[in-house]
Amino acid sequence: NVFVKIATTYTDENGNYEFSRKFSAKPRYRICFKNRVGFSIGLNLILIPASISAIGKGSSTGIDLTIDKNSDATLFRRCVVNNAAYDYFKKCQATGVTMPPKNLRFWILNILRPSSTLMMHHGALLDNKLVSKYIGKYASIVRIFAPDITIGSKDKNGDYAALYSTTVHEMAHASHFNKVGTDYWRKYATYILTSYISTGDCYGTGNGENAGYCEIGEMWAYYMENALYKERYGRNPGFGNEYWFKSQILSELEAGGISRSDILNCMGYYTNDIKILKSVLLENRADKAALIDKVFKKYGR
């Protein structure tokens, strides 16, 4: 007979942990990328709820492990995405920004550069052909596992900052999704997928059908990405400043005293172009009318 003892636990935000059971022999350690906060990272192409990284045998009293860019590449990617998503949730709690929905499903795809927030697990009904063309070799399992967020990690291996900024960008989209719902998201995501498949650029030129959804969504996501990057690394990298939409508008509104939560609260279901956004901002923050007019005029809006 073979006796197998299994113990599971969660680490705290600093990576510390303690098992409730003791071992007499060296156990085999594994990290499962699922947590109490509300998201999981998967999958290993098998029927499990989240990705698992095998660490190997270690001391019966516990194992200390430092994961960096020289570690296993898959393990590093998973850890960075996990840390970034956890950090985003904490930022939402601190600032009052709407949380992403619970039970988010992440896929980390090393065959792709672009990332996306499809929100399929949360009911966004997207064209299967478009999604399949985007996901590539993972198309056969899309319908079963329905990802919410895909992180394209190609050319980002070993680059903590790049993976971090990409992840918080997509998490910002998930917060926006929680404000607007599935019908809004279908139009928005369809624009993104169609633009990427037809031109190789996710955002198009701003003239296509439903481009207004893209403008609002990407302004918010790039604004949050830049803000959180600056808080972590001490500088604003200006991600997205070259595109036809202008996330700088939101950055300058925040600098002038309009909070992140106030901005997102103006991005409800009916806010699907820049003119409506300005109108809602003026209605909700009439005390900042001069600032709003000045900033929108500065960027030709």
Language-model segments: which ranges?
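Pan-zinc metallopeptidase signature
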Residues: G234-R301
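Metalloprotease/metallohydrolase-associated module, dominated by Zn2+-dependent proteases
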Residues: D201-G257
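Short, acidic Ser/Thr/Gly-rich low-complexity loop/linker segments typical of extracellular
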Residues: V2-N16
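Active-site scaffold of zinc-dependent metalloenzymes
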Residues: L118-G181, Y191
